[in-house]
């Protein structure tokens, strides 16, 4: 099931989108993610705001006691 959570709650290597119809992104560290829509820059790594809201499968969200 898709849930709307903060970026900091995602597990490392979790796939997510910034909007429901958005492109796929993958979290690679606590503050960075890889964006599949960026083709000009290699590697397409983007800094993230830890409080940014993203859409993700509930299986890839850290439990509250793991934060």
Curated annotation (Swiss-Prot):
<protein>
    <recommendedName>
        <fullName>Uncharacterized 7.9 kDa protein in mobB-Gp55 intergenic region</fullName>
    </recommendedName>
</protein>
């Amino acid at each position: 099931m898709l849930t709307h959570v903060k970026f900091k709650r995602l597990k490392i290597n979790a796939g997510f989108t910034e909007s429901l119809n958005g492109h796929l992104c993958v979290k690679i560290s606590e503050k960075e993610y890889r964006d599949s829509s960026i083709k000009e820059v290699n590697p397409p790594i983007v800094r993230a705001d830890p409080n940014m809201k993203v859409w993700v499968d509930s299986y890839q969200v850290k439990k509250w006691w793991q934060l």
